[in-house]
Amino acid sequence: MLRRAALAALLLLASGCVYYPTVMDTGGVRIRTENGRAVRQGADLLVTLDVLSTGKYGDTIVGVVSPVAKQALLVNGAGGPVNRLEIPGAATVKFTPDSTHVVLASLQRPVERGETFIVTLLFEKSGGIGVVTLLE
């Protein structure tokens, strides 16, 4: 009887010593977006945002889409097209008007100031990840 009680106590104690690995430990990809903002630039919208990669490995943006525009482009600070953008693991990449950002051209409908809409970044590994974007 004492032996069973000791074994039960030992098993109970050992069950509390469980290791739960994080995304970094397992080596996965984890991407999150935030701070989506848009401003008018002529007839187009210029979108800035932050991409947070908290996984061990990075991912690559291969495209952009949005229901408010017929054309969504990933461009560099000079306005030239960017076909692919590497997002390294364990890093934050800021999209600003002076660096890489998104341009929404040929708007499908009028977008009013204060309105929110989704811009979807298409990743090679993670698929589509939406950014809630506010027109300022």
Segments from the language model and where they lie:
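Compact, glycine-rich, soluble single-domain proteins
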Residues: 18-136
